[in-house]
Structure formats: C-alpha cells, structure tokens
Amino acid sequence: MLTAPDNNHRPLFAAKDIKPFYLEHGPKIFPHHSGLGGTIIANLVRSLGGPKYDGKYLHEVVREKLGEIRLHDTLTNVVIPTFDIKSMQPILFSSYQMKKCSYMDAKLSDICIGTSAAPTYLPAHTFTNQDSQGNLHQFNLIDGGVCANNPTLVAMNEVTKQIIKQNSDFFPIKPLEYSRFLIISIGTGTARNEEKFNGETAAKWGLLDWLTYNGSTPLTDVFTQSSADMVDFHLSAVTQALHSEDNYLRIQDDTLSGTESSVDIATKENLQKLSEIGQNLLKKSVSRVNLENGLFEPLANGETNQHALTRFAKILSQERRLREMRSPHTTKNKKPLVF
C-alpha cells in the first residue's frame, strides 16, 4: 500500500501512516472474541468451523483505500508473493512479470487481500482478472508467507532475472554480482527465546494440538519461522562470503514474549507495546546470523539499526543522482528500483 499512488502521483501512504492505520483498523480486522471457558476455547471452537475471522472489514478497508489502482500503477517496482491453493503453486505479482503476462495486472486490493489470507485466520481470496485479449484468469489465493515468509530471496531473484535479460535498469551488473545489491529485510518479530514448546510435550501431540496449543499455532509457527530463518541464513552466508555483509541489513527482534508475538491480538495495549518495541529496535545494534551456531547476534562495531538505515538511504540517494547524471532524459520518469 506504500507504493500506491494518490491523485497527484505521490505515495498514497507514508511510512509514518503505518502506526495510525494499525491502531485504528487492527482491532476491527482482528476483533477480540470470548465465550464459555475463555478466549482460547472460544477461538478453538471458531477455528474448527472455519477461519478465525471473516475478513469482511479488512476487505472493506483495503478496497476503500486502493480503489481501482492496479499493479502497473505502483510508484516503485514491486514483487508480492502469494500462493494459489487451486494450482498448488506460488504466484508472484511482479512489476516486471506483468509486462509479459497482462493477466497478472490485477487490482492491488485483490493482491493485498490474497497475500494476507493466512490459513486458519482469514479466508482464501478468489477473483478473476482479464488479460489484454479479453480472456479471464482465475486466482485462488492464500497468504504468500506459506511459500515465502521472508520474501527477500524472491525480490533478489526478480532482479537477477532482469539482469540476465540485460534490462538497462541494471547495466552493467552481472547476474550473481551480489556485492552490488543493497538489501533491507524487515522482520515482524519472533518469540524464539520464549521456548514455548519442547520435544517432550510435542511428542504427545495429535493433529489438533499441532494446529492449536495454548493459544498458539505450532504447525504454522514451525513452517513460517523455519522458512524465514533459512532465507536469512542463506543471505548471511552469501554476503559474508563475498565480503559484502554491510550491504545486507536484517532488522528483526527475536525476544518477543506473550501476546507480543501473536499474529492477531490487536488490542490497544498490545499494539502500543509493539509500537514501543519497534521504536526501541531502531536504537539496538545491527545484528547478524552467526554462521557457527545460527543465532541472531549483535555486531561488535556498535552501529545501530537507525544509523544503518540512514547509511543505506544516503547510498540510494547517491545512486539515484548518478543515474540521473548519466541519463537525464531516460531516468526522469523511471520507477525507483525498490522491492
């Protein structure tokens, strides 16, 4: 939604609008339910009969904000992973792919609703889109996190494909010249240090326990966490091997606990707590995966996440100026290469 244009072809939302948006709409997207025996039992009963939430308010808000804006309208190049439950394969809505496959130029509202349809939490999203020949194509989408919970590699693969095709936007970079990549990867926090589960307990679980246990969703947590961690580990290994680790910034907090790590507890108190955690995260030292033990550890140089983001912003600004100097007539109206 940050890349959607307003009527003046400026961003519809700024980063500063994210917090107020969640504070206003979060409690309505994820309403608190209680029932006989308390919230946990009420949620369990609801989950057995369908998605935990009907998604109606989320759909309403997204459609109201994004209207008729389509993928080709975005102010930056984007790639948005989803998963098609009918064809059982990932679907990537990419600014570059769309130019070749016109049926991928869907409404941003449909793409956003589809990629946020987390299994057990929100319903799958089905819609059709017309290609340039008038043919209808159907999509049956669920949350892209099931295939790319950390979509960093997805974005890098899109860039690599364009380099192979000799797209002038990336000249003269070579396909695997990762030292020329500038990567910012922002996580949503984990409760790794809380150690909610253990082998002795899990050994006794049946299907229902794996799906929901003490207010958590173990099976979902395991798949999403491992998927994100493997991407981070891979990128850390590659960038360190190429001596370009300063070009990869992973911002993540793995010290969450209790309701802080919940997917859907959107009470005012919890959202304020998460906001404070985010602010404090800016002041923390840049951390990186230790390739020996797999732990996310702060670096010794003392650079904070805030300083690292400022450094990246300066590099991007300089790169933009250089491109404009080299080709002032062709770059003026090009989209920034941000994924």
Each model region followed by its residue ranges:
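Conserved catalytic cores and adjacent C-terminal regulatory segments
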Residues: 1-339
